[in-house]
C-alpha cells in the first residue's frame, strides 16, 4: 500500500478489527455525532466554523501517541496539539518532559474529558486544555505542534503553519501527511504512521507543483537530528 495515499489509509482504518476500546470509542463517536448535529443547529459558536474546516474526532492509538512523542521528545519550547480531542497526546507529552504542553479543542465534551484524564493522572495543574477553534489559535510562540486531522483541511493548515510558526519549529502529522511539505522524518507503518516537518528560515521544503511527497523508504522509521531553535 502507498503509505501516503489517504484513500488507502481510510480503507485500512475501516478494515481493522475492533477491540473493546475501539467499540467504546465508536459509541462515544456516535454520541459526538448527535452533539455535532445539535451544535450545528443551536450553538452559534460552532455554526460559525465552516463545514469544510470541521474535523471529526477519532482518538489516537497508543502506538500513534508513542510515534508522535518519538519525534518530539527532548525538544525545547511550547508543545501544542491542534484538535486535541480527549487530550491523550498533550498529557503524554507533558509526562515525557515536553513543557508547557497544551491542547486546543472546540468540542466542550472532549475538553471536559481531557481535563478529567489530566486530573486522574495528577497533572490537572500542569497541562492546559482550551476550548478554542484551532484556526484561531496563534502559533507564533509554538515550537512543537502535533495534528491528527482529516486530509481535507491539511492544505489550509499548511498555509497557517507556514505563516505563523517560528524558525526551528517542528510539526508532526499523524495518519495523513501534509500534502506539499517534505518530511524530515517518518515513523511507523499504516495508520500508525506519523510524519515530522521542520520549519527553516525560508519555510519548509515543499514538493514541486504541490505533488505530495512520498514516504521516506524505510521499513519502520527514518529519523534525523532535531531542528535547531
From Swiss-Prot:
Keyword Transferase: yes
Region (Pre-methyltransferase (preMT)): 43-77
Biological processes, Gene Ontology terms: peptidyl-lysine trimethylation
Transmembrane annotation, as ranges: 20-42
Uppermost EC category: transferase
NAD in keyword set: no
One Gene Ontology molecular-function label: protein-lysine N-methyltransferase activity
Membrane topology: Single-pass membrane protein
Enzyme Commission code: 2.1.1.-
Any one GO cellular component localisation term in the record: mitochondrion
Disulfide bonds: none
Top-level taxon of origin: Eukaryota
Keywords on record: Membrane, Methyltransferase, Mitochondrion, S-adenosyl-L-methionine, Transferase, Transmembrane, Transmembrane helix
Entry note about domains: The pre-methyltransferase (preMT) region is responsible for mitochondrial localization.
PANTHER family found in the cross-reference section: ADENINE NUCLEOTIDE TRANSLOCASE LYSINE N-METHYLTRANSFERASE, METHYLTRANSFERASE DOMAIN-CONTAINING PROTEIN
Protein name listed in UniProt: Adenine nucleotide translocase lysine N-methyltransferase
Organism annotation: Mus musculus
Native organism taxonomy: Eukaryota, Metazoa, Chordata, Craniata, Vertebrata
Gene: Antkmt
